[in-house]
From Swiss-Prot:
Single GO molecular function: ABC-type molybdate transporter activity
Class of enzymatic activity (EC top level): translocase
Organismal lineage: Bacteria, Pseudomonadati, Pseudomonadota, Gammaproteobacteria, Pseudomonadales
Keyword Cell inner membrane: yes
Database matches in InterPro entries: AAA+_ATPase, ABC_transporter-like_ATP-bd, ABC_transporter-like_CS, Mo/tungstate-bd_C_term_dom, ModC_ABC_ATP-bd, Molybdenum_import_ModC, Mop_domain, P-loop_NTPase
Name of the gene encoding the protein in the UniProt record: modC
Compartments where found: Cell inner membrane
Similarity-based family: Belongs to the ABC transporter superfamily. Molybdate importer (TC 3.A.1.8) family.
Binding site for ATP: 34-41
EC number, UniProt record: 7.3.2.5
Protein name: Molybdenum import ATP-binding protein ModC
Keywords: ATP-binding, Cell inner membrane, Cell membrane, Membrane, Molybdenum, Nucleotide-binding, Translocase, Transport
């Protein structure tokens, strides 16, 4: 079992105090999510050693990087991290190849976990090696920056809003490469963002920060479904589901996706995928309606038997949020208070969730 990443920080600023006590997974992608000024980047910089917490303890894979009580503070260059900033800081007078080799040459050959060819293939930049950075698009520059960070053979990748400076099209170009790194490399990543769509697509674990404090930390599918958190109140409230492709209807071009841990399925309009492929989807609370019985005379494809777990007022007092259990998979529904009363909703009640739309994330 991979050792967790421990981060305990105490830092005082004029505007707010950062206070964290986190045990994060030592594998996969952990997202630090929250509004601007919530302390996301400060936490990342402390983990990197670019800032020193007044009181701090940081341990990564059983190696202590900071222990203020015992006077331990490992310099940034000794922490085996790959740091990706909002904008790639490349040497414009060097080619892409030379930029990548600059980082690679610092790592003794026996300690290299990733070679140049592997990094360029993973990020799709083989054809850019002889170009200068000023001839690259913003998305290409960022992919080169990520490749350069990988070539330092890090034990931990730190990504500080790496897509924030890019437009929607460029973001869409880079996200598949980040997903590929997630699938193919055994390197944990801490990913800072305030964009919920990025987090929903990439993260396995979610840390929600506000004003320097940790509001929640847990697996993304559980954390997004919590009604006591601000995420459930917004218009983008919804859950992430990672199901398994179990069938494909070529005539109607519909995937059948089996929900984890159950026999329940959803059908999703999508190109054909190999049976057994894991598929991540998002179901928005606003796209889920409730019925006391299954309506077979409806255009809605996905109707699932569910049990009511809890209910809470939404930010708009005309609505309520309902947390549901669909065979072990959490769902959220946003309905009017009037509808809740008409259905006589209560904990433990069984009914049908009608899902009007399913968004494929990855």
């Amino acid at each position: 079992m991979v050792s967790p990443i421990e981060v305990r920080l105490q830092m005082t600023y004029p505007e707010f105090t950062v206070s964290t006590d986190l045990a994060l997974p030592g594998a996969g992608i952990t997202a630090l999510f929250g509004p601007s000024g919530s302390g996301k980047t400060t936490c990342l910089r402390c983990i990197a050693g670019l800032e020193k917490a007044e009181q701090g303890f940081i341990r990564v894979h059983d190696e202590v990087w900071q222990d203020s009580e015992n006077g331990v503070f490992l310099a940034p260059h000794k922490r085996a991290i790959g740091y990706v900033f909002q904008e790639a800081s490349l040497f414009d007078h060097l080619s892409v190849r030379a930029n990548l080799e600059f980082g690679l040459k610092r790592i003794p050959r026996p300690q290299r976990r990733i070679e140049l060819q592997q990094a360029t293939e993973l990020l799709g930049i083989d054809h850019l090696l002889e170009r200068r950075p000023d001839k690259l698009s913003g998305g290409e520059r960022q992919r080169v920056g990520i490749a350069r960070a990988l070539l330092t053979s890090p034990r931990l990748m730190l990504l500080d809003e790496p897509l924030a400076a890019l437009d929607t099209k460029r973001k869409g170009e880079i996200l598949p490469y980040l997903e590929r790194l997630h699938r193919e490399l055994d390197i944990p990543m801490l990913y800072v963002s305030h964009a919920q769509d990025e987090v929903a697509r990439l993260a396995d674990h979610l840390v929600l920060l506000e004003a320097g404090k940790v509001l929640a930390s847990g697996p993304i599918r559980e954390t997004l479904a919590r009604l006591d958190l601000p995420l459930a109140m917004g218009d983008d409230a919804g859950v992430v589901i990672e199901g398994t492709v179990s069938a494909y209807d070529r005539h109607y071009q519909l995937l059948t996706v089996t929900l984890p841990g159950s026999n329940l399925c959803m059908r999703v309009a999508h190109a054909e995928l190999q049976i057994g492929t894991l598929l991540r989807v998002k179901v928005q609370a606003r796209d889920v309606s409730l019925n006391l019985q299954s309506d077979d005379h409806s255009s809605i494809l996905n109707r699932l038997p569910v049990t009511v777990l809890e209910e809470a007022l939404a930010d708009n007092l005309a609505h309520v949020l309902v947390k549901l259990n669909a065979g072990g998979t959490p769902l959220l529904a946003r309905i009017t208070r009037y509808s809740s009363d008409q259905l006589n909703l209560h904990r433990g009640q069984t009914l049908w969730a009608q899902i009007k739309a399913v968004a494929v994330l990855a």
